[in-house]
Amino acid sequence: MREVTLERNTNETQIELILNLDGAGRYEVDTGCGFLNHMLELFARHGRFDLVLTCHGDVEVDYHHTAEDIGIALGQAFARALGEMRGIQRYGSFYLPMDEALVLCAVDLSGRCTLNWDVHCKTEKVGDFDVECASEFWLGVARNVPATLHFVQFAGENTHHILEACFKGAGHALAAAVAIDAAHRDEIPSTKGLLV
């Protein structure tokens, strides 16, 4: 079973999480931010990952450190759960329509960090959540898997819908990338023989 328990503690955040890549989409999430909770629950549900996550952060400042550090911790958890990435599909992509919004998420578990965030929201906040914290979250994930992540928005007016499409789409794309390739279970999916 590809399951990891992880703690990450700094002066800004204290994070505990359990991630199971081969789960059923069950989640218990408490980040101190209602909107971020909602996004992570959608990510877990649509990726079919089991995720238990608590974060106590300096939310009296804002949600920047909370979002960034959860992204870092989640990326580290994926890296540990995947190990040397033997037998995985490696790539995944998904177009996610959410009402009027349409976003593509594409993933390469390449061992190299790239985030292309081509997402353009028309408001700076959803509730009290700063929209720019969404890209900080995904940059934390990308740096710590490490992985290449592309988010490309094709349509959308409502900021909530656009970000929801990003998180749901990422769940689907990552689920495809971490899926085991039964025909090549013992192989690392790279001509180099390793993913770095």
Indicate residue ranges for each PLM-predicted region.
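N-terminal intrinsically disordered, cationic/polar leader segments
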Residues: 1-196
